[in-house]
């Protein structure tokens, strides 16, 4: 009798775990935007490739993308590790497959910048399809 109860308890636990994994939606668009901004700041080109859509990768393999980005940013030390804080200002999810995130980057020695990161859900994961600098809002006197 105890053996049957133990087997039943294990089966229920495994079933619950399977259901929990099946219903997990993964990172939100805000999570992906935060990771994308930090990857740019750290020149983590492998992570950028993973978070980007095919269009943002220009059709390059992971290895080619990383090699090309490292070559492009070699010697550009002033462009690395300049972000002190990333804030998600707004998330607009148009539907289950499209979202837009506005971020604000507080920089170490420069005024803050804002970006708009557009994403699509591709094969169950949010991927960046567009990354644009947003102009600063006009200040009122």
Predicted regions: what they are:
Residues 1-9, 46-56, 109-112, 135-139:
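Short, charge-rich amphipathic segments
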Residues 85-141:
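Exposed beta-sheet edge and beta->alpha loop/turn motif
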Residues 28, 37-40, 57-61, 107-111, ...:
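Extracytoplasmic/periplasmic, Sec-exported soluble proteins
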Residues 25, 30-31, 35, 46-100, ...:
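Short solvent-exposed beta->alpha transition segments
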Residues 1-42:
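Short, low-complexity N-terminal intrinsically disordered segments enriched in polar/charged residues
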């Amino acid at each position: 009798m105890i053996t049957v109860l133990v087997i039943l308890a294990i089966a229920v636990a495994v079933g619950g775990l399977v259901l929990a994994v099946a219903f997990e939606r993964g990172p939100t668009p805000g999570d992906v935007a935060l990771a994308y901004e930090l990857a740019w700041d750290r020149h983590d080109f492998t992570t950028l490739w993973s978070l980007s859509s095919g269009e943002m990768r220009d059709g390059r393999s992971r290895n080619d993308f990383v090699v090309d980005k490292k070559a492009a940013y070699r010697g550009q030390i002033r462009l690395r590790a300049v972000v002190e804080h990333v804030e998600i200002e707004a998330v607009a999810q148009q539907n289950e497959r499209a979202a837009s995130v506005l971020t604000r980057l507080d920089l170490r020695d420069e005024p803050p910048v804002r970006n708009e990161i557009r994403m699509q859900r591709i094969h169950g994961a949010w991927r960046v399809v567009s990354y644009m600098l947003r102009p600063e809002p006009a200040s009122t006197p």
